[in-house]
């Protein structure tokens, strides 16, 4: 059984604000998230997840509850294999996609994650969008190096 206070918080939020949660997200919570949390064969690497949250919030900014909710699923495993090896996140213009993904993938590239030479791929609608995301990550890394 997976226990994560950030997931519980988001599930409670969704139940208390049903008009703010779209139909597809409600279906995802009902048919994927809640059954997954009840499984005994899924391991949640809470230590690495907590390190991720701490790393992101100390090197970038305070994360929103929905970010912590989604990030948690990157640390769930069945037989040492990620339950969700790929994530597809669909967000509109100006919603902060770079701010969502850059801290997480940057964490994956640190020794705190524990995987040497971790490979990250970012897919976008255009080469310029991918370059923008890379530039955000690169510029932030320069800031941290100079500190």
Model-derived segments and spans:
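Phosphate/NTP-binding elements of NTP-utilizing enzymes
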Residues: 1-146
């Amino acid at each position: 059984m997976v226990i994560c206070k950030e997931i519980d918080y988001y599930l409670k939020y969704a139940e208390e604000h049903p008009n703010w949660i779209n139909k597809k997200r409600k279906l995802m919570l009902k048919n994927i998230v809640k059954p997954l949390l009840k499984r005994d064969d899924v391991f949640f690497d809470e230590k690495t997840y907590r390190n991720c949250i701490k790393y992101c919030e100390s090197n970038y900014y305070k994360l929103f509850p929905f970010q912590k909710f989604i990030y948690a699923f990157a640390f769930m495993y069945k037989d040492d294999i990620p339950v969700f090896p790929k994530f597809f996140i669909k967000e509109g213009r100006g919603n902060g996609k770079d701010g969502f993904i850059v801290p997480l993938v940057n964490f994956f590239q640190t020794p705190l994650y524990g995987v040497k030479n971790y490979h990250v791929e970012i897919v976008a609608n255009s080469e310029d969008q991918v370059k923008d995301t890379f530039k955000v990550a690169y510029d932030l890394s320069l800031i941290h190096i100079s500190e």
